[in-house]
Structure formats: structure tokens, C-alpha cells
Amino acid sequence: MGRFVRRLLRNLLLALFLVLVAGPVVAVILYRFIPPPVTPLMVIRAVEGRGLDHRWRPMDKISPALPRVLIAAEDAKFCEHRGFDFEALQKAYENNESGRKIRGGSTISQQTAKNVFLWPGRSYVRKGLEAWFTVLIETFWGKKRIMEVYMNSIEYGSGIYGAEAAAQRYFGVSAAKLTQAQSARLAAILPSPLKWKVIKPGKYVAKRTKKIGKATGAVRRDGLADCVA
């Protein structure tokens, strides 16, 4: 009986290691070199009947305006941090504890880890896995690859994923031809692309678009996007 229990525990530990350590490492290394074909969210939305328009484009086929705009809108310290912006997390925690509208403090790296490898949700298990995958992609991918995958996996509306699909659907151009103004309109609907609209935006999105445009000027001036240039 003792031998059986020890063997069972050993097998369970091995399985746990494979699931939590080896499996994620292998997946991250694999996606360092090949485009992620689909994400869990894409599958979920497709099952919901929203369709799936996703066209991968390498970094050099996407307008340099888009990463600058996304850094301005989502993560001004993207080139500085190692996956986590602890100051932003603290501000988000204080904001949420005060009873105001829930605010996230996720970096682009964290969002990429969530988008590519995990399911939507706010459970502690998912957040823990998100942190683990964030460490892995920061270690094995580097900033350019993280941004490349991020731009290709963002949800931009019902069934619309990535820069190319969004550029074609909303503006009738390729991702390589996106202007800063168009990129700002895309960024303005994040993180609620099913709620807010790129075309005929409401007051909130219009105001946010202008704010992002101004912030992008600072990103360019201060070299905050140099790591993906």
C-alpha cells in the first residue's frame, strides 16, 4: 500500500509538473517561432456564433503607428518593465477598493499572455496562470515578439481579431497602411470591443481617441516605443 501511494503521488507530481511547468514552456517556445493559429477567446466567440476573421501579419507588415498608439493607450511603460507595472497595479487596487468602477492594471505583456493562452475570467487560478505565462513570454519572446503577437490577437469587435482584420473591416486598408488617427480609433475601443464602436463612435470613444492621439505624441517624442521600432 505504501509503495502504491508513493507511486501515485510521484505520478501526480509528474503530471502537475507537465501541466504547470513543462507544457507552458513548450507552448511559449513554440509560439516564439510560429504564429498562434487561434486563441481560446476566438474559439469561445466562434461557438457563440460571432464568426472568426483573423489574418496574421508579421511586424513589418503592420504600420509602426499602431504599436506606438497601443503603448500610449494601454501600457506607457511597456519598454521599461519586465511584464508587470506594479505602480499601475497599486493604483488599480486602490481604485477598486474605493468602490469606484473596476479598473485593471494589466500590461500589454499580461494581456498577451491572457489572450493567447488562457480563458476569460477573474479567478485567482487564471490570474496566477496569467502571471506565470507573462514571465515566460517576457523571458523567451522579448518585447518585439510580444507586441507582434498582441497586435495579431486583440479582439476588435464581434468576430474581428488582429490588426489586419480590423484595418480591412473598418477602414478598407491593410494593417500596413493604418494611420495614427485610425490606430487611435482602434485602440479607443479597448478593452471593451463588443461594447464600443470604431465606426460612428459615441462621445466616450471619440474623447478617448483624442486623448490617445495626444499621448502618442509623447510616446514618439520620449522614445517609449523604441523597443518595438
UniProtKB/Swiss-Prot annotation:
The keyword Cell membrane applies. Its main location: membrane. It catalyses: [GlcNAc-(1->4)-Mur2Ac(oyl-L-Ala-gamma-D-Glu-L-Lys-D-Ala-D-Ala)](n)-di-trans,octa-cis-undecaprenyl diphosphate + beta-D-GlcNAc-(1->4)-Mur2Ac(oyl-L-Ala-gamma-D-Glu-L-Lys-D-Ala-D-Ala)-di-trans,octa-cis-undecaprenyl diphosphate = [GlcNAc-(1->4)-Mur2Ac(oyl-L-Ala-gamma-D-Glu-L-Lys-D-Ala-D-Ala)](n+1)-di-trans,octa-cis-undecaprenyl diphosphate + di-trans,octa-cis-undecaprenyl diphosphate + H(+). It is an enzyme of class 2 (transferase). Pathway: Cell wall biogenesis; peptidoglycan biosynthesis. One of its GO terms (cellular component) is plasma membrane. InterPro entries: Glyco_trans_51, Lysozyme-like_dom_sf, PBP_transglycosylase, Pep_trsgly. It is a single-pass membrane protein. It comes from the Bacteria. Peptidoglycan polymerase that catalyzes glycan chain elongation from lipid-linked precursors. It is found in: Cell inner membrane. This is Biosynthetic peptidoglycan transglycosylase. The chain crosses the membrane at residues 11-31. One of its GO terms (molecular function) is pentosyltransferase activity. Disulfide bonds: none annotated. Belongs to the glycosyltransferase 51 family. GO terms for biological process: cell wall organization; peptidoglycan biosynthetic process; regulation of cell shape. Keywords: Cell inner membrane, Cell membrane, Cell shape, Cell wall biogenesis/degradation, Glycosyltransferase, Membrane, Peptidoglycan synthesis, Transferase, Transmembrane, Transmembrane helix. Its EC number is 2.4.99.28. Pfam families: Transgly. PANTHER family: BIOSYNTHETIC PEPTIDOGLYCAN TRANSGLYCOSYLASE, MONOFUNCTIONAL BIOSYNTHETIC PEPTIDOGLYCAN TRANSGLYCOSYLASE.
